[in-house]
């Protein structure tokens, strides 16, 4: 006696009239909450004539969806291009060291925020700060109208490390380079 091993044929070959529902068709019916995909059985699969054929509606949707997708992709490309152009413009306004340093988007935003704070301090302090670092002026300067109050106690000054403003530091380096050049020229 001989036995033959048969593999089961794929369902799409045995039952070509059964197809998966698209997301639009699926959303029109109630969901059972399971992850199973519902199936659709064409009426002509059993020899029953249906009054309305779905293929015409489906074919129209297939032509419309790529066009909508292309326009959505074009809008997204335009939006991304606009955002990148704005970041490029912002990068040109922020001083960096070295000057040709490439900044990421998050670095650009953080440096822009820091630079705005620095410029605000420069406007508040003005030329009253002699060391070229308006961001390091003590809080008493701001509260008492120009440093007329007593300086803060030494203990509180030494308890926390001094914060360094990148832009003040950069400005201070430029000033010291200028002084060094002037000194070298005079010598």
UniProtKB/Swiss-Prot annotation:
Gene Ontology, cellular component aspect: nucleus
Pfam family for this entry, one: HLH
Major localization class: nucleus
MF terms in GO: DNA-binding transcription factor activity, RNA polymerase II-specific; protein dimerization activity; RNA polymerase II transcription regulatory region sequence-specific DNA binding
Key word NADP present: no
Location in or out of the cell: Nucleus
Biased composition (Basic residues): 50-72
Bias type Basic and acidic residues, positions: 34-43
SUPFAM superfamilies reported in the protein's UniProt record: HLH, helix-loop-helix DNA-binding domain
Record-level GO BP terms: cellular response to BMP stimulus; cellular response to fibroblast growth factor stimulus; developmental process; regulation of transcription by RNA polymerase II; sclerotome development; tendon development
Tissues where this protein is expressed: Expressed in the intersomitic, the superficial proximomedial limb mesenchyme and the subectodermal mesenchyme.
Keywords carried by this UniProt record: Activator, Developmental protein, DNA-binding, Nucleus, Transcription, Transcription regulation
Residue ranges, annotated region (Disordered): 21-83, 140-163
Residues in bHLH domain copies: 67-119
Cited PANTHER family: BASIC HELIX-LOOP-HELIX TRANSCRIPTION FACTOR SCLERAXIS (PTHR23349:SF5), BASIC HELIX-LOOP-HELIX TRANSCRIPTION FACTOR, TWIST (PTHR23349)
Description of how the protein assembles with itself and partners: Efficient DNA binding requires dimerization with another bHLH protein. Dimerizes and binds the E-box consensus sequence with E12.
Name of protein: Basic helix-loop-helix transcription factor scleraxis
Record organism: Gallus gallus (Chicken)
